[in-house]
């Protein structure tokens, strides 16, 4: 029998007392339980998050191009950002897991944390509407938006530009290893620019590991030029 949802902790996170506990119970149930889980709410919450962030970027940065806004949105809505916010709120402590996922460390998975906060946004949207979802999103993401003084450049794009500007071959990425269970994988990716330099990094997804590897290699190359 599952433990009852901690409604007091949930209310502290979303900023209001939930009326429809069924929605929030679903938003915080992992598929490993064998019950209905958060995947559909995650799908919805991901779209709500994107809409609210895109609208806010459009309003706050009137001179920004479509490409600049896309770069900002990519960072703000990334799995890494969502996971960091979920962990700061201690949201994983409320997620229900099956025994195997729990013993595999599911509560410490960034992927699951990111999925859960999107599912929570989906539940909040269904229960209280777009304005409540917007209030929650801006309360948690607002400081990050304010902190974006310039549109961030994706490390892979920056590394590509570095190589092209110096007449080097474009970066090449390869999977070194993939470990961990399906719900909490760990990828190790290597990136190299010919025989000039190489770096490796890990991530909870192939994309995250590639990004981290590109950032590591770029930092190394730029450090050599100083």
Swiss-Prot record:
PROSITE patterns: DS_RBD, RNASE_3_1, RNASE_3_2. Its EC number is 3.1.26.3. One of its GO terms (molecular function) is ribonuclease III activity. Gene3D superfamilies: 3.30.160.20, Ribonuclease III domain. Residues 7-129 form the RNase III domain. Pfam families: dsrm, Ribonucleas_3_3. Residues 154-223 form the DRBM domain. Its main location: cytoplasm. It is found in: Cytoplasm. The active site is at residues 46, 118. GO terms for cellular component: cytoplasm. It comes from the Bacteria. Keywords: Cytoplasm, Endonuclease, Hydrolase, Magnesium, Metal-binding, mRNA processing, Nuclease, RNA-binding, rRNA processing, rRNA-binding, tRNA processing. Its cofactor is Mg(2+). It catalyses: Endonucleolytic cleavage to 5'-phosphomonoester. Mg(2+) binds at residues 42, 115, 118. One of its GO terms (biological process) is tRNA processing. Belongs to the ribonuclease III family. Homodimer. Digests double-stranded RNA. Involved in the processing of primary rRNA transcript to yield the immediate precursors to the large and small rRNAs (23S and 16S). Processes some mRNAs, and tRNAs when they are encoded in the rRNA operon. Processes pre-crRNA and tracrRNA of type II CRISPR loci if present in the organism. This is Ribonuclease 3.
